[in-house]
Amino acid sequence: MTEDTGIGWRGWLTRVLLLVLLASSIGAALLYTRYQRFLEQTISVSADGLLYEFRSGASLSGLARDLAERGVIDQPRMLGLLGRQMDLAHRLQAGEYRLRDDMTPADLLRLLADGDTEHYSMTVIEGQTFRELLNAVRASDVIEATLETEDAGEIMSVLGYPGEHPEGRFLPDTYHFPRGTTDVEFLQRAYAAMQQQLATAWEDRQEDLPLDSPYEALILASIVEKETGRADERPRIAGVFTQRLRKGMRLQTDPTVIYGMGESFDGNIRRRDLQTDTPYNTYTRDG
């Protein structure tokens, strides 16, 4: 090989390498620009958002492919790259999420990493019987049904409170929870909320009340509320009932008769109803 040939060959190689480097630089610049555009754009969902379930055991790459197939993002590989860059690849939590139209891909990943799932609500209604509450829980399409028995005593045992009567044990309130919450979890939460409120009220009670437990106080309060819908009348009625208890008298209050009649109550209380013994009838039972 002559000297001129060697110089020519090296010059040609240099030009090729420069072209390769230039192409690589341009490619890298284009990729960087696309990545920055991907980071800044919002995801494609409707104005109402999209309820999306990220299943247990799913991966970041699986999430990216699924979102791309749904048209939520257009660059699944870039979402995977972003997840690894943010160190969130193994921190995504299973659950149902609402993806909003103002979210960037980074917002979406943070939502799943934080476990900020969509929440639903159910209200335990004041005066609701345990059977009515149980039916409402079972009618929910977001609460998972696990209780297989209809027996109230068995249900209380499953909840962890064997031997306790279920009536009045669940605090009337609105509860928020994610999809997949079980019926047991929901009832345990409402039970715990009532226990906390009862404990607070019991601590603040008058010491001379003729009541032996927080549950007895709850029963009396429930009877008073059923006697009248007017808050200004309740102290007077509670005082009357308290005096009867101190004297060892029966309360003889109609709401306890109605409660004992259950679904057979047609809006009227007859003499035979007052005389029919039930666990709740204060015309036939003391205390």
Residue ranges: model-predicted function:
Residues 59, 135, 141-147, 156-287:
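Bacterial extracytoplasmic/cell-wall-associated proteins, especially those involved in peptidoglycan
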